[in-house]
Amino acid sequence: MDIIQAIIIGIIEGFTEFLPISSTGHMIVASKFLGVAETDLTKAYEVIIQFAAILAVMLIYREKITFKKIDLWMKLLFAFLPLAIVGFIFKDQVKALFNVQVVAWMFIIGGIIFLIVEYYYKEQAWHVKDVEKVSWTQAWWVGFAQIFSLIPGTSRAGATIIGGLLAGLDRKTSAEFSFLLAIPVMAVVSGYDLLKHYQDFADANWGAFLIGFIVAFIVAYATIKLFLVFLQRFTFVAFGIYRIIFGIFLLMIL
């Protein structure tokens, strides 16, 4: 992987990881057009840029990553449990699901679900507007929704945001809870992948890896900030439409 490829993939990871559009499908397209083979080394690089994305969230929400916010973090860990349990038990079945057809169709299905939810969703005065006021029950339902992100192409952000909306959170709080929930999820997943691929770093182009890490961090940081501004004025309809179009595009080219 050269520096240009590392930068482009870093941009895609940073931009798509926290939006409800699934980074998986975009990585597939990027790898195809960039001619990047799916090797252990590229998987190792993906681990590096995922850590960059985690750091972006931690920097933005650094005031919430303290012992004073222990109640919030207990709820986030509680929400993480369904995914951890189901993912561990059915890891082989989940791995068998990974193919482009599944990814494409989950883009389309996820897009349709977003459009349906937004058609009926109306923000109410009783909706939770502060991520620290999310209840244990609401945290559980967001965590339950996250299970569906085990299906490739679903989008972890998309599943948790939908779960948040259905559980009674407003749009911004749904997104913020999703961002924070990404920290334990991605830390565990990326940590596991790091242990699996640490030997592959011996052959790494560290210059490309470092630049990709920095790019992914900057893009993820900017994307989260802009996404929150976007949600103050708009709904998730645009993401639903985009998912459907991108899913059809995937079916046509791959």
UniProtKB/Swiss-Prot annotation:
Catalytic activity: di-trans,octa-cis-undecaprenyl diphosphate + H2O = di-trans,octa-cis-undecaprenyl phosphate + phosphate + H(+)
Documented EC number(s): 3.6.1.27
GO cellular component: a single term: plasma membrane
Topology term for the membrane: Multi-pass membrane protein
Record flagged with keyword Transmembrane helix: yes
Keyword check for Nucleus: no
GO molecular function, one term: undecaprenyl-diphosphatase activity
InterPro entries, sorted: UppP
Recorded superkingdom: Bacteria
Segments crossing the lipid bilayer: 1-21, 41-61, 70-90, 97-117, 134-154, 175-195, 209-229, 234-254
Subcellular location: Cell inner membrane
Pfam families (UniProt xref): BacA
Keyword set, alphabetical order: Antibiotic resistance, Cell inner membrane, Cell membrane, Cell shape, Cell wall biogenesis/degradation, Hydrolase, Membrane, Peptidoglycan synthesis, Transmembrane, Transmembrane helix
Main location: membrane
Chain coiled-coil ranges: none
Family classification: Belongs to the UppP family.
Function: Catalyzes the dephosphorylation of undecaprenyl diphosphate (UPP). Confers resistance to bacitracin.
HAMAP family: Undec_diphosphatase (MF_01006)
Note: Bacitracin is thought to be involved in the inhibition of peptidoglycan synthesis by sequestering undecaprenyl diphosphate, thereby reducing the pool of lipid carrier available.
Protein name: Undecaprenyl-diphosphatase
Provenance organism: Sulfurovum sp. (strain NBC37-1)
Gene: uppP
